[in-house]
Amino acid sequence: MRYGICTGIENAGLVKKLGYDYIELSVTKTMGLDPAAYAAGKKALEESGIEAECFNILFPKTMNFVDGKTTSLDALEIYLEKAMAMIADLNGKVVVFGSGKCRTCPPEVKYLDAYENLVKACRLTGEIAGRYGIRVVIEPLSR
């Protein structure tokens, strides 16, 4: 059995020291770092010898790709290219497609329309992740 922990990239050294096998980083938080903080975090990750194998929180709460109006497929594609490039840059292998708020069907949207939009978003996510050699795992959320 292997153990990982969800935390920020700046904690890579501590995670290794505590005996964890890997670190799980937030996509949105890591993408939100300024260039200097990102570089420092990447250096800390490399120096610690711990791997950032898995990433969570793929999408920011401001996105919604099931309602058909908040986030276009074009905007989603641009975002995913940046996200997957960052994950690959940190040698990530897996990203969790959770992000419940982004895939919540608003009451005014027909369920079938929301479902079709979600399928499009999942396919696009998988296609882009595949180009970077990243596996997408879907978190089974029920709300």
Question: What role is predicted for each listed range?
Answer:
Residues 22-24, 54-56, 96, 137:
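Conserved beta-strand positions in the central sheet of alpha/beta enzyme cores
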Residues 1-3:
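Extreme N-terminal starter segment of soluble prokaryotic enzymes
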Residues 66-143:
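Active-site acidic/histidine proton-transfer and metal-coordination neighborhood
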Residues 57-63:
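Aromatic-lined carbohydrate-binding surfaces of glycoside hydrolases
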Residues 8, 57, 100:
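Histidine-centered beta-alpha loop that forms part of the nucleotide-sugar donor binding/catalytic region
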